[in-house]
A protein has these predicted regions:
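Conserved alpha/beta-hydrolase "acid-adjacent" motif
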Residues: 259-265
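Cap/lid segment of the alpha/beta-hydrolase catalytic domain
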Residues: 93-151, 208-216
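N-terminal cap/lid segment of alpha/beta-hydrolase-fold proteins
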Residues: 37-81
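Short beta-strand element of the alpha/beta-hydrolase
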Residues: 73, 83-93
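Active-site nucleophile elbow and catalytic-triad environment of alpha/beta-hydrolase enzymes
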Residues: 226-241
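C-terminal catalytic histidine-bearing segment of alpha/beta-hydrolase fold enzymes
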Residues: 267-328
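Primarily recognizes the serine-hydrolase "nucleophile elbow" in alpha/beta-hydrolase
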Residues: 154-213
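Short beta-strand/loop motif that positions the catalytic acidic residue
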Residues: 245-246, 251-254
């Protein structure tokens, strides 16, 4: 369940590698029920503020998490009456990034509003007020926070699809790093999403477990303890879901300048993903670059049948800063 590149880079993972042989397919109800929630419960939207931009209105909101507490989010609404396409965005978890939250894709979402997109950008559990850092790599919260992140995204879909100005047939998800891991699991779980952009994320714990880095991590943590944890949460291996993403289309964006998720390893991850899919590599660090942004906007424009955006508007979106690794 999660980014092995971050696990091995930081030693202290955001989400551990969860692997068990001969796992059930994603359609297995016993696996899927871990992500059930009460869809009939009130969403509980509350407004905290509003910013009116030239091409869109940005609402600062919260909605209730089925796992407790509230989910802070931005809701970006285009001008006009719709019907609009809808995109959910999942941010990265890079430790010392100021964009380790719903702000990561805000500028991109505002530009896409010109093409007719309503966007929901959420704060993952790590970015919410009162979150306590997890220091133990096999702390149960590694798993429970990942489960909450997935369910909160499903609840966010409920929020979007409850709107009369959203076209239910034009819904996408964009996720980066940890957000890509969440999206990979969603792709085999929630059929309401028609297209996925998964950026710089590992797609299979089984692939990761074959690496030397994983074996070293296993010995460091304690093989018996880690194996027990892995077995308990085996249903969180995103490879069991993204291999069943079809008929949704998946666009995988990988960075060539990764310390762990090398192009060779990334190709093995890409092979796990069901067709139809697209795969592209970029000469960039984990944050990716402007070329990747142009490509995913083009992909989203085609998949969601959006209005073409001015090149100047796309070029004006700032690049995500890549901080140095705090553990090096």
């Amino acid at each position: 369940m999660g980014t092995v590149s971050r696990t091995l880079r930081n030693v202290l993972p955001i989400c551990l590698l969860l692997l068990i042989p001969n796992a059930s397919p994603a359609q297995d109800p016993d696996m899927l029920r871990h992500f059930d929630y009460d869809q009939k419960a009130p969403i509980g939207i509350k407004h905290a503020g509003v910013q009116r931009r030239a091409q869109a209105t940005v609402y600062d909101i919260t909605y209730e998490s089925p796992k407790g507490g509230v989910v802070p989010a931005y809701l970006v609404v285009p001008k006009g009456s719709g019907p609009f396409a809808a995109i959910e965005w999942g941010h990265w978890y890079w430790q010392n990034s100021s964009m380790r939250n719903r702000k990561e894709f805000l500028d991109e979402a505002i530009v896409l509003a010109q093409g007719g997109v309503i966007s929901l950008l959420t704060d993952g559990p790590v970015a919410r007020p009162g979150h306590e850092p997890i220091k133990d790599p096999i702390d149960e919260r590694q798993a429970t926070e990942f489960i909450q992140a997935v369910i909160d995204m499903r609840r966010g879909l409920d929020l979007l699809l409850a709107r009369k100005d959203v076209d239910r047939q034009r819904v996408a998800y964009v996720g980066h790093s940890y957000g890509a891991n969440v999206g990979a699991l969603l792709s085999g779980l929630d059929r309401r999403i028609k297209a996925f952009v998964l950026m710089a994320g590992s797609m299979s714990d089984e692939v990761n477990a074959q690496t030397k880095g994983y074996q070293e991590f296993r010995q460091k943590v304690g093989a018996e303890k880690l194996d027990a944890f892995v077995a308990k949460y085996s249903y969180l291996d995103q490879g069991k879901y993204v291999s069943h993403a079809a008929p949704a289309v998946v666009f995988l964006q990988f960075a060539n300048q990764e310390k762990f998720l090398t192009p060779e390893l990334a190709q093995k991850h890409a092979a796990i993903v069901s067709e139809p899919k697209q795969v592209k590599f970029y000469e960039a660090p984990h944050s990716l670059n402007a070329e990747a942004r142009r490509d995913r906007i083009q992909f989203l424009t085609e998949q969601l049948k959006l209005k073409r955006l001015p090149e100047a508007a796309i070029a004006g979106i700032p690049n995500l800063y890549q901080p140095p690794d705090p553990n090096e």
